[in-house]
Amino acid sequence: MTFLALDVGNTRLKWAQYDAPVVGAKLLAHGAVFLENIDRLAENDWHGMPEPSAILGCVVAGDAIKRRVAEQMEIWDVLPRWVHSSPQEAGLTNGYDHPARLGSDRWVAMIGAYHRLLARGIRKPCLVVMVGTAVTVEAIDASGKFLGGIILPGHGIMLRALESGTAGLHVPTGDVRDFPTNTSDALTSGGTFAIAGAVQRMVDNITRHCGEAPECIMTGGAAWKMAPSMSVKVELVETLIFDGLLEIASRRFKP
């Protein structure tokens, strides 16, 4: 019973095929494509792939993208299922004012992070940081309640905003420096410090609220670039959303 997991973000679609819809399943294949190339998945990445027994995904890119992805899966006689944020799932309680409005990728990543800690016997507050097109920082207490989170622009959005609103800032990407002495480094360092500072503020908030410092788990396409500049210790987990999808699938697709 193979299982196909999908993470459809704002920029790329990432997929992973496992030998079963269970936690700890063996990874058989995986890949990623930019959204402009998803109409060729059936003839490229998924060509010749055995038909999965179950498909589960999360999508934040909108209904039009979801329909295009669904069309590519018509090569199989399997109906894909999509995660929608709910009041409770897999041991987590959703503290959002309107739970269904929470981005499904944020919800799935939190489920993956929470169970990653539980598997190691850790019951502590947790921050989940996703660094991609946008940056999100989610706070979860030791009981598994999502307390709330923040959203801020990713590096690319910050730079484009400055370029469009300020004359003379069309410069190459720079490096992160403690004291930048050129515009390229100043822009790159400013964006990096803004993200790192937001995470530190959330660490302070949850530490004050829960009475102990949190574990910090970071994921996303730009997480590896951000990690060296963080002021707090973070654990980098590339597969966090897939881990969350496996946790959900193990409950939804029971034999």
Swiss-Prot record:
A biological process (GO) of this protein is:
coenzyme A biosynthetic process
Give the note describing cofactor binding and stoichiometry: A monovalent cation. Ammonium or potassium.
Pathway annotation from the record: Cofactor biosynthesis; coenzyme A biosynthesis; CoA from (R)-pantothenate: step 1/5
Q: Where in the sequence is the signal peptide annotated?
A: none
Top class in the EC scheme: transferase
Q: Which GO terms describe its molecular function?
A: ATP binding; pantothenate kinase activity
Q: Does the keyword Lyase apply?
A: no
Q: Where does substrate bind?
A: Y96, G103, S104, D105, R106, T183
Cofactor(s) listed in the protein's UniProt record: NH4(+); K(+)
The GO cellular component terms are: cytoplasm
Under catalytic activity, the entry for this protein gives: (R)-pantothenate + ATP = (R)-4'-phosphopantothenate + ADP + H(+)
Entries under InterPro entries matching the protein: ATPase_NBD, Type_III_PanK
Question: Catalytic center at which residues?
Answer: D105
- Oligomer and partners: Homodimer.
Q: What is this protein's record name?
A: Type III pantothenate kinase
**Biological source species:** Polaromonas naphthalenivorans (strain CJ2)
List the lineage, top down: Bacteria, Pseudomonadati, Pseudomonadota, Betaproteobacteria, Burkholderiales
